[in-house]
Regions:
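Acidic-glycine-rich active-site phosphate/pyrophosphate-binding loop
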Residues: 1-22
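Nucleotide phosphate-binding/pyrophosphate-handling subdomain across enzymes
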Residues: 17-134
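Short catalytic-loop micro-motif centered on adjacent basic/acidic residues
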Residues: 79-81, 168-170, 192-193
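Short glycine-rich anion-binding loops that position phosphate/pyrophosphate groups of nucleotides
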Residues: 85, 112-115, 140-143, 196-199
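Short amphipathic alpha-helical segments
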Residues: 92, 120-122, 148-149, 182, ...
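Short, solvent-exposed amphipathic alpha-helical segments in soluble enzyme
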Residues: 95-98, 123-127, 152-153, 187, ...
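C-terminal helical cap/extension that packs against the catalytic core
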Residues: 126-187
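A glycine-rich beta-strand to alpha-helix segment
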Residues: 176-207
Length: 210
């Protein structure tokens, strides 16, 4: 497998000229990263950078923190961290992972961020995990919100199972997560932690529990 995206780009510049760049490579996965790099490429062409320098710069770009960053390996399984906390972001990350790791079981560890966001986008979240095989669901990171959710969290979990057609496990804290990983994560799998709350720091703590 490869942990990069490759694509061709056709750009119409402000002077109406058409430029075509073949086989652009970026060491990042996901449609959202391709969209960002195409915008950067168009700008670079507009200000006069050469195609070779543009391709070199994109090829060597390391990305930003918490955008599909590999954080550790356990039982020969790679664990990644991503800031995705909106249904659209989740879909794009999982779609990119599916294309590259097509023969792997894809496990998403998700921590919803803010009660209000989950209330407003409940249906969108429930169907956002279709490109995963399994979801491990954390309690909501409230970010200080004190409003009521308005529905059962277990019912929300069932809705994810129904709409995204995945297996799902509820965990209450990082200790339950560590136990689950230790005894269940091995073989041909890939694991992505997603969320804008404490999930990132918890994921990075996992190796000390094994």
């Amino acid at each position: 497998f490869r942990e990069y995206s490759e694509y061709d780009l056709k750009v119409r510049l402000p002077n109406k000229k058409i430029r075509v760049i073949k086989k652009i490579k970026i060491p990042l996965l996901g449609l959202h990263n391709i969209k960002n790099s195409t915008a950067a490429t168009a700008l670079a062409l507009t200000v006069g950078l050469s195609i070779s320098n543009i391709k070199k710069g994109l090829r060597n770009f390391k990305g930003v923190q918490r955008r599909f960053n590999k954080i550790f390996t356990f039982n020969n399984v790679d664990f990644f961290d991503d800031y995705a906390h909106h249904p659209t972001e989740i879909k794009e990350v999982l779609n990119g992972v599916k294309k590259v790791y097509s023969n792997y079981e894809k496990i998403c560890i998700f921590q919803p961020h803010r009660i209000s966001r989950l209330k407003d986008l409940k249906a969108e979240f429930a169907s956002a995990f279709k490109d995963a095989d399994k979801v491990i669901l954390f309690p909501i990171y409230t970010a200080g919100e004190k409003i009521k959710l308005g529905f059962s969290y277990s019912d929300f979990a069932k809705e994810i199972i129904k709409k995204s057609k995945v297996k799902l496990f509820l965990v209450n804290d990082k200790y339950q997560l560590a136990k689950y990983i230790k005894y269940n994560i091995y073989g041909k799998k890939i694991v992505i932690g997603m969320g804008a709350g404490s999930i990132s720091s918890w994921m990075r703590e996992m190796p000390k529990f094994f």
